[in-house]
A protein has these predicted regions:
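Exposed, low-structure sequence patches enriched in small/polar residues
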Residues: 1-172
Length: 172
């Protein structure tokens, strides 16, 4: 179990908040391991001031964003793993409320005899706007990095193959 809490105050202007303000952030993680199962739950609550430009007067309003994530990993056998993740985001600013979710399924295969590795993902996401975007790390080729912001509605999938036929050669 990990818990983090931060209360902060801004005395000078910053991005999307030109008026000084204060806020808080709370993050929690719970992880449970049992034999072939791994289960983790993540929670994040942000309450930050943001500018509201409706009307002639600039004012600061509270922007609350909550994120929930549940991940289950199951070792089917020594070489094959399955990972399921579901995430939900809730956003509130003044009377405006938005939400969004992500669901993905990973299958990961690793062969010891042929030095072959395969990773497959199928993801579905549906959010109301960019405010409720959900970030999901994607496995990539060596030294490649992908951490896209998923928003609106869509399907995303990939298949990575990694084969090492000889000691000094790796094919992706």
């Amino acid at each position: 179990i990990n818990i983090y809490c931060d209360r902060f105050r801004f005395f000078s202007p910053r991005y999307q908040a030109t008026i000084p303000g204060k806020g808080k952030e709370i993050v929690g993680d719970v992880t449970f391991n049992c034999s072939r199962w791994d289960c983790s739950f993540h929670f994040k609550h942000e309450d930050k001031p943001e500018d509201d430009k409706t009307g002639e007067k600039l004012q600061s309003v509270s922007r609350v964003k909550q994120e929930y994530r549940l991940q289950l990993t199951y070792s089917i056998c020594e070489r094959l793993k399955s990972r399921t993740r579901t995430s939900y985001t809730h956003y509130v600013k003044k009377e405006r409320q938005e939400g969004g979710y992500l669901f993905y399924q990973d299958l990961m295969y690793s062969s010891l005899q042929t030095s072959l590795k395969a990773q497959f993902r199928f993801a579905y996401f549906d959010t109301d706007s960019y405010n409720t975007r959900i970030y999901a790390y994607e496995n990539n080729v060596l030294y490649g990095y992908s951490f896209p912001a998923l928003y609106d509605r869509g399907i995303r999938s990939y298949l990575n193959l990694n084969w090492k036929p000889f000691t000094l050669i790796t094919l992706y």
